[in-house]
Amino acid sequence: MRHALITAGSKGLGRKVTETLLAKGYSVTVNYRQDEEAVSRLKEACPDCLDRLQFVKGDVTKKEDLLRIAEAALNRFGRIDFLINNAGPYIFERKKLADYTDDEWYGMLEGNLSAVFHLFKAVIPIMRKQQFGRIITYGFQGAAHAPGWLHRSAFGAAKVGLASLTKTIAIEEAEFGITANMVCPGDIVGDMKEASIEEARMRIGKEKTPIGRSGTGEDIARIIAFLCEENSDLVTGTVIEATGGLNVINKNQTT
């Protein structure tokens, strides 16, 4: 049985990925930070999967927690086939670089880039022994080309660095049957993070995307599930955008 480790997998986009992988028969270790209610809701939604589901509390900005999460996954299920780096802090306040505090800057880098480095270091040796692995990171529209993103300098810098790291790992680990790809969700907000595509289509015309509907957690989960398949090994080192045609990073740009 293939096993997935997903950070922040109990709610939002992560929950939809967790549910999709469970539906495919995989076992999943779900990391969460502190929301026990979200864990309870996910357990209630998947009563027949509890023998394939493990929850591990931890803060992805802390190296010791990341190592403990990876160890828990390996100890319980004996392998880690898929590493889904879903967690990543984000500052919603819109402000320019000069207005960031040091803590905010380093928090963005630690949570969105260094955390992934530590998980890579822990999980890649396991995948090498298996001669199989699928690594997924998250980015934003245009991350592969290092665009400027007004009022999102710290987050943008971390994710652009992560795009390069993802592509590098794809090259370095290809000989071991390991692929690495970045998925870039569009403007998926609120309850749409846990929504289905069908639910989004019921709201066609109410969204500002060119396709007429919002992106959903299911959109992202379907892409990730495909990338995790054994026969998806030809797809590696890619940055895949799922935006519905919306120009996400420039929609609020005025200067």
UniProtKB/Swiss-Prot annotation:
It is an enzyme of class 1 (oxidoreductase). InterPro entries: NAD(P)-bd_dom_sf, SDR, SDR_fam. Its EC number is 1.-.-.-. GO terms for biological process: fatty acid elongation. It comes from the Bacteria. NAD(+) binds at residues 7-14. GO terms for molecular function: oxidoreductase activity, acting on the CH-OH group of donors, NAD or NADP as acceptor. CDD domains: SDR_c. Pfam families: adh_short_C2 (PF13561). Keywords: Oxidoreductase. PANTHER family: 3-OXOACYL-(ACYL-CARRIER-PROTEIN) REDUCTASE, 3-OXOACYL-[ACYL-CARRIER-PROTEIN] REDUCTASE FABG. Belongs to the short-chain dehydrogenases/reductases (SDR) family. This is Putative oxidoreductase YtkK. It comes from Bacillus subtilis (strain 168). The gene is ytkK.
